[in-house]
Amino acid sequence: MALEHEFGIINDINNEKTYQSYTPDVHNCISVEDDIIENLLEPLSAMKTYFHSLNRPEYGLAYCGITIIPPESLSQFLDVVISYKDMEESVDLSELVKKIIQAKEENKYMIHIGI
C-alpha cells in the first residue's frame, strides 16, 4: 500500500482548536500519493501555514503531521500544484486542484494530514 497524504477543507475553523486526530471524513479529504508530495515540499516551503493549530505559525507542509493552510496561501498552493511537471498525468493532482479552487472560492482554510 502506497503512502498517502490527505487534503480537505475546514468548514468551520476554530482559533482555539488543536487539529491532531486523523479525521479525513470530517473534512471530505482527497488523497495524494507521497511520491508526488515529496516533489512539492521544496516549492511549498515558503507557503505560510500553521502546524496543528492557528497558534503555531509555520511554513510549508508538516510532512508527518497536520498542516492548516489559510485562505491567503491558497493561490500560492494552487500555483505550485499546477506548475508541477506531471500535473496533467496525475488524477490525484487534478483532484487536489479542484479542492484548492473550492476552498479559494469559499474563502476557507484547508487541512493537510501527512503520512
Regions picked out by a protein language model, each given a short descriptive name:
Residues 1-106, 115:
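Acidic (Asp/Glu-rich) sequence patches and key acidic residues
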Residues 111:
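Conserved GNAT acetyl-CoA-binding A-motif
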